[in-house]
């Protein structure tokens, strides 16, 4: 495994192919824990992981906390409704409170883009050793979700060796609300870095044509792209055309809470044009894995029958894989010195 160089994890645009391989390899080793019966490792014993979630979350928060506990870390969970934020305390002061209590890792989720980066930069300026892991910020990024989706696909294509090479040359369709999705943005960086060609599909209001250039240049403030030869990224409007020849498809939740009024005329029409079902997938000619980062609007992004068919979709695998992926990230970030014995 190559040396880990990321002090904070804020965005997958900074990841090299070797970084993806390091995370997936470690996650694959951690995923063997339930099989061997070993429920905990002493790797992060004595470390404190604090989950600072300023947005509601079920899967991500629970997954991070379970991951930390399986590595024997102590966990402190922050809730805005019962915190001093309601008394006027700033977000930075809240974070510093956890740093003062000895937090080694802050997992931060916030509705505003850039908050995890701002906290990381503030801690760097004062020389704190605490590191920040982005648990999802605004429309910007959701690194751990992008990584677990990548791992789920690699696991499907090569169960015994689920590494980035399993994605090279694959055709992956992402359909739905790309505009409002931090998950989609993280997946675009991850999938193209591993050599997959990505086809985006949806109405122009949710998949602007400009997304075809999303990975063409590094983000502002980043000098260069750590991946020299990314996969292709294209936008296709017709879902049947997009699915023809696809190796996998991911459908995204319609984030109605982030939409302006009248962005969609009808949910029924959306499902008819862009929803997934057993019937729609027949255009693929061969079975392909169906992913969804959750939560699912049943009967909108995916038919109820397809969602209930665990042989056709990988939704539960995504949830399951969140734990070893987040264990890998916490282990790498905390620079644990305990040897692994899986």
UniProtKB/Swiss-Prot annotation:
Pathway: Pyrimidine metabolism; UMP biosynthesis via de novo pathway; (S)-dihydroorotate from bicarbonate: step 2/3. One of its GO terms (molecular function) is aspartate carbamoyltransferase activity. Keywords: Pyrimidine biosynthesis, Transferase. It is an enzyme of class 2 (transferase). It comes from the Bacteria. Gene3D superfamilies: Aspartate/ornithine carbamoyltransferase. GO terms for biological process: 'de novo' pyrimidine nucleobase biosynthetic process; 'de novo' UMP biosynthetic process; amino acid metabolic process. Its EC number is 2.1.3.2. It catalyses: carbamoyl phosphate + L-aspartate = N-carbamoyl-L-aspartate + phosphate + H(+). Carbamoyl phosphate binds at residues 59-60, 109, 142, 145, 294-295. Pfam families: OTCace, OTCace_N. GO terms for cellular component: cytosol. Heterododecamer (2C3:3R2) of six catalytic PyrB chains organized as two trimers (C3), and six regulatory PyrI chains organized as three dimers (R2). Catalyzes the condensation of carbamoyl phosphate and aspartate to form carbamoyl aspartate and inorganic phosphate, the committed step in the de novo pyrimidine nucleotide biosynthesis pathway. This is Aspartate carbamoyltransferase catalytic subunit. The gene is pyrB.
